[in-house]
Curated annotation (Swiss-Prot):
It is an enzyme of class 2 (transferase). This is tRNA N6-adenosine threonylcarbamoyltransferase. GO terms for cellular component: cytoplasm. Keywords: Acyltransferase, Cytoplasm, Iron, Metal-binding, Transferase, tRNA processing. PANTHER family: TRNA N6-ADENOSINE THREONYLCARBAMOYLTRANSFERASE, TRNA N6-ADENOSINE THREONYLCARBAMOYLTRANSFERASE, MITOCHONDRIAL. Fe cation binds at residues 115, 119, 306. It comes from Pediococcus pentosaceus (strain ATCC 25745 / CCUG 21536 / LMG 10740 / 183-1w). It catalyses: L-threonylcarbamoyladenylate + adenosine(37) in tRNA = N(6)-L-threonylcarbamoyladenosine(37) in tRNA + AMP + H(+). Its cofactor is Fe(2+). Substrate binds at residues 137-141, 170, 183, 187, 276. SUPFAM superfamilies: Actin-like ATPase domain.
């Protein structure tokens, strides 16, 4: 008889309070998400103190709703998984504190999950991850290529040297007068415009897998400011298309080069910006033309943003590898990706 595992998973690293119940690492029984976007829009970005207060208000409600929707009792659970970094320290502390209290009260093991590993493991809800694999993580705080030779081994082979792609989207969106978060709006505008501004593609042809988006951001801002000074009206659609094409060209070039140089069986696209239609379509086309053997797995659109389900998927894998934490677990806002799971025990 197959053994069943049930994990309560908690995510609170930024501006989403999310709790999920995950069965066997790849079946979602519930995935409650309390978003704070409306509270942060007027500030043009996430305010850490506001985020923390919202998490405090929502965390116990989300836990109760997740269990109720999953029709799972506390005594049915096998473990509690929680994001402990990277992220906003105050926000992380709410989730970590709640997870520790729940685990202690119900005598359950506690699984510490790196938020970025969670994003990668959202792919489990599409199909099993096959190793060796490469993950392209594109989000508000990270743009990374992560090589995974085997399960629970993570090696960053390329990362942004300045702004993350998602961060650049939000800053450019602010200049365009778009609401935060601006990624979806820019993507929609881009599909209606043309790449007429030919913004720079930083590091596109350099012999490495690193990214840089600060120069693109500056070029975009300078173009808009110059137009304002001479009372020239620029097309938002063309601005969005030009900006997005620059981002996509660089990300695609680096990813394709990595796939050519590494012997991998699967490429995973994950993170908030992984929901971008332009990026998904371009990678589909480029990879389809260049590789016959490569399995390209895109995280489900509704699981690209922060959510508890992905933490549960990663948590189940870590549980099988006996990665647990005790009640001294603390939030680590600057948690690095090149980590040694054994050191957490």
């Amino acid at each position: 008889m197959d053994q069943t595992s049930l994990i309560l998973a908690i995510e609170s690293s930024c501006d989403e309070t999310s709790v999920a119940v995950i069965k066997n690492g790849d079946i979602i029984l519930s995935n409650i998400i309390a978003t704070q976007i409306n509270s942060h829009q007027r500030f043009g970005g996430v305010v850490p103190e506001v985020a923390s207060r919202h998490h405090i208000e929502q965390i116990t409600i989300c836990i109760e709703q997740a269990l109720k929707q999953a029709e799972v009792r506390k005594e049915d659970l096998d473990a509690v998984a929680v994001t402990y970094g990277p992220g906003l320290v105050g926000a992380l502390l709410v989730g970590v504190s709640a997870a520790k209290a729940f685990a202690f009260a119900n005598e359950l093991p506690l699984i510490p999950v790196n938020h970025m590993i969670g994003h990668i493991y959202a792919a489990r809800f599409v199909k099993p991850i096959v190793f060796p694999a490469l993950a392209l993580l594109v989000s508000g705080g990270h743009t990374e290529l992560v090589y995974m030779p085997t399960e629970n081994e993570f090696k960053i082979i390329g990362e942004t040297r300045d702004d993350a792609a998602g961060e650049a989207y939000d800053k450019v969106g602010r200049v365009m007068g778009l609401k935060y978060p601006a990624g979806k709006a820019i993507d929609e505008l881009a599909h209606q415009g043309e790449d007429i501004f030919k913004f720079p593609r930083a590091m596109e042809h350099e012999d490495n897998f690193d990214f840089s988006f600060s120069g693109l951001k500056s070029a975009f801002i300078n173009t808009v400011h110059h137009a304002d000074q001479i009372n020239e009206e620029l097309s938002k659609k063309d601005l969005a298309a030009s900006f997005q094409q620059s981002v996509i060209d660089v990300i695609t070039a680096k990813t394709v080069r990595a796939c050519e140089q590494l012997e991998i069986k699967q490429l995973i696209l994950a993170g908030g910006v992984a929901a971008n239609r332009g990026l998904r379509d371009t990678l589909d086309k480029e990879l389809g033309e260049k590789f016959n053997h490569l399995d390209f797995v895109k995280a489900p659109l509704d699981l690209c943003g922060d959510n508890g389900a992905m933490i549960g998927a990663a948590g189940e894998m870590l549980m099988r590898h006996q990665v647990f934490a005790d009640m001294t677990l603390n939030a680590d806002p600057s948690l690095e990706f090149d980590w040694e799971p054994e050191a957490i025990k």
